[in-house]
């Protein structure tokens, strides 16, 4: 990691590969015999140094956007092309490309995804792309179109998941190292932390399953409507036992009272006075535009009508972010908060559903391990929709 100010490191996504574990993994994943290697975001040269130590002298095409980075002694600045790699005019096709691209959010996703896309187009047939990237890459909506394209032209052959978010200085980032090979006829299997697994591509979302799992799988969205919870936009104001007008589920055993009114003033003078005391901060909420006609409204009354039409029916709730091993539970449909997703059975599903068995599968390590990041389970609506569940767990 450089000694640049932390703000600059974060702005440019400069999380250099000082970890011996990550450097060794990149070298281990090089299965071709390249004589010329592309490093599109060389930084100070950690990966190039490690490659030369492992394989001897190799020719490297190195690119870096920041000419102020102090290079390692083994890297000659004359051999580095300074500038924006994504705009370089390049025609050479590579047998091997390695890198730890910058992790910087953009309007459409993240800069490292753009690096993957550009480098994918620079691979020769049978070429390998070995990158260190945030571990949620294979679950991101913004990455799905790229992954769909990559899976038509090749596959991910190796993945290393350290499950350690402390591998970079001044940052907590859970990462994976992947090897992708541009060969469309390869089997859809992957060495995942030295265990051979089946690789499952569901419309650009990648999950993994045991080679011994021979039962069929079905998409959650084929059996459930997956709903996101409501967002008040100011919990300190709307969550109130004294003036609450409705109950909102925030966990398996947590149900809180919240204020939700359709019009102001309401029939409760004390409630009106309470809300008026917070009017300024409610108007200043940034979730959407608030003014004199809607300042007392919630930030996002998401799925209020859909939930209202299903109140009291059986459903499954899934925690979106938790370290608990129980991420799902069966309950009745009720209004619920933003920390959970609700799985409401579809009336036109292919089969009747056994919710208890479905919850058992969702809570199994087989399912959870696809969405664990340094011990934390994290899942979003699209990811859950595209997730596969064992059809024995869902059909009766």
Where do the language-model regions lie?
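C-terminal substrate-recognition regions of SAM-dependent nucleic acid methyltransferases
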Residues: 29-32, 176-324, 332, 346-396
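Short, Lys/Arg-enriched, disordered terminal segments
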Residues: 1-5, 393-396
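Short, well-ordered loop/turn elements at secondary-structure boundaries
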Residues: 92, 124-125, 254, 310-313, ...
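Short glycine-enriched loop/turn motifs at secondary-structure junctions
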Residues: 8-10, 335-338, 383
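Substrate-recognition/cap regions that form aromatic- and gly/pro-loop-enriched pockets
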Residues: 327-339
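Signature of N6-adenine DNA methyltransferases within the class I
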Residues: 2-28, 35-59, 63-232
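Mid-to-C-terminal catalytic subdomains of enzymes
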Residues: 342-343
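Glycine-rich, often proline-containing surface loops adjacent to acidic residues and nearby aromatics
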Residues: 128-131, 253-258, 339
């Amino acid at each position: 990691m450089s000694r640049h100010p932390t703000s600059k490191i974060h702005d440019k996504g400069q999380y250099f590969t000082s970890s011996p574990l990550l450097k060794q993994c990149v070298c281990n994943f090089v299965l071709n015999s390249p004589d010329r290697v592309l490093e599109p975001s060389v930084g100070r040269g950690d990966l190039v140094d490690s490659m030369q130590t492992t394989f001897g002298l190799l020719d490297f095409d190195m690119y870096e956007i920041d000419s102020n980075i102090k290079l390692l002694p083994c890297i000659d600045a004359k051999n580095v092309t300074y500038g924006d790699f994504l705009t370089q005019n390049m025609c050479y096709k590579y047998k091997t490309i390695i890198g730890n691209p910058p992790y910087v959010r953009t309007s459409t996703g993240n800069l490292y995804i753009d690096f993957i896309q550009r480098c994918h187009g620079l691979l020769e047939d049978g070429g390998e792309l070995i990158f260190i990237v945030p571990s949620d890459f294979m679950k991101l909506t913004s990455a799905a179109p790229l992954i769909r394209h990559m899976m038509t032209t090749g596959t991910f052959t190796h993945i290393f998941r350290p499950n350690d978010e402390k591998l970079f200085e001044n940052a907590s980032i859970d990462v994976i190292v992947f090897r992708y090979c541009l060969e469309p006829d390869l089997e859809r299997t992957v060495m995942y932390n030295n265990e051979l697994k089946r690789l499952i591509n569901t419309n650009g979302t990648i999950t993994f399953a045991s080679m011994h799992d021979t039962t069929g799988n079905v998409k959650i969205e084929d059996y459930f409507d997956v709903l996101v919870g409501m967002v008040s936009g100011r919990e300190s104001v709307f969550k109130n036992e004294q003036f609450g007008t409705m109950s909102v589920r925030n966990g398996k055993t947590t149900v809180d009272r919240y204020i939700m009114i359709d019009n102001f003033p309401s029939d409760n003078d004390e409630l009106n006075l309470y809300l008026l005391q917070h009017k300024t901060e409610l108007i200043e909420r940034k979730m959407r535009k608030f003014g004199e006609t809607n300042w007392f409204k919630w930030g996002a009354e998401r799925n209020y009508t859909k939930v209202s039409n299903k109140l009291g029916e059986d459903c499954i709730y899934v925690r979106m972010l938790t370290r608990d091993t129980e991420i799902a539970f069966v309950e009745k449909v009720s209004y619920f908060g933003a920390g959970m997703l609700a799985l409401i059975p579809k009336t036109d599903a292919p089969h009747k559903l056994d919710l208890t068995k479905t919850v058992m599968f969702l809570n199994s390590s087989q399912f959870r391990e696809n969405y664990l990041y340094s011990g934390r389970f994290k899942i979003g609506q699209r990811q859950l929709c595209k997730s596969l569940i064992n059809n024995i767990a869902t059909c009766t």
